Amino acid sequence: MEGFSRDLLCGIGKGDAPPPEKRPGQLREEMEEVELSLGLSLGGRFGLDRKGSKLPRSSSVAAMLTTPVEVPAPPSLSRASSLPVQAEASEVERKQGLDGWGSCREGGGLGVQHAARLPASGNPSSASSVGEGQILQGTLMRTSSLPAVIEASGNDDWKKRKEAQSLKRLEVKKKRIERRNSLACNTSKEAAGQSPKEMNANTDKLVSSDETIVSANESHSSGKHLVKGLPPKYQATITSEDSSSAMRKKPNSAFKGTAITEEQNSSSSVPSSGEAISSVTAPSLPLLSLVPITATLGSREDQSILGRAGARANGMGDVERRMMQEMPGVFTKGLSNGSRVEGFLYKYSKGEVRIVCICHGSFLTPSEFVEHAGAGKVDNPLRHIVVSATPNL
């Protein structure tokens, strides 16, 4: 109703006063255009005065209405150090003056060297130069719980401790190796059975007993070597080993038993005095002492040859004995002269048969084996050869 109020007095009593100024509402009414929105908009106003001040349009985004707030920067904090620099600096100034606080404090404790004096503002970069120009500007002081001198000494102690530990490890390792070597030496000596002194004493006893034996023990006619001072059983084994090595060199005479029996008979013909002495001394010695004793008797070359031949003969004897056990034995039967010859099959593969006769040890075919029995040539020799169930050993 304010816009439609009238002045009923019509300016009575105003005199020559200037005309009243127009109110802002009247100016707005004159300036505004005709509104055609029917007052249905969000900012419309219902009532008589439709052209009054409208409400501001609300927004769904709150940031558009709020002005950016500037957050003030936090105040700069002074740099913290584990060493009380300012307190010690004030103490040094109080005791020695302004010109001596930059040097190390002498005393019973640790010496601390100050790099810069912090100003009142607490900013370490803006250090003021106080003293004799020993303070560095624009540099930060080293932060550490211990001075550099203590750290250097700690590193040296650590290195020394590591070196001592490595030396102890090397000593323990060396002792372990020495203990292992000593144990190995002791076991080898125990395996030998006797010390070298005891072996030499035993050999001296045998040599003194051998002087009473007749020198006829050495028989070089058959090419065999007999060891002095040993009982007949040892001599028989040595001669059998030599004969077996000779049989291995000559396969035609491999299965002759006459040489071994003759050598055993000749070895048993040793005088009774030698048998008595050797039987007394030999059983008292251990078996391991026979090897060094035989090595000292006779020439070294003959003894080494004898040992190697005996070892080979023992090995070959086992192999040949096993082969003979696996091979079937044969013998002749039904011949005209009635003779019987025994042997065994050496090879019996396809189309090849070899028979070894026991009497001479020769390798023969079936026809030759029948002729060897004295029957002459036969049309079918396999009819006169019979395979036995057990081998002829």
Swiss-Prot record:
Annotated segments matching region Disordered: 1-27, 155-200
Keyword list, A-Z: Nucleus
Superkingdom, taxonomy of origin: Eukaryota
GO cellular component, one term: nucleus
Cell compartment(s), UniProt: Nucleus
GO biological process, one term: signal transduction
Primary localisation category: nucleus
Sequence ranges of Basic and acidic residues compositional bias: 156-170
Family the UniProt entry places it in: Belongs to the Ninja family.
Official protein name in the record: Ninja-family protein 1
Species in which this protein is naturally found: Zea mays (Maize)
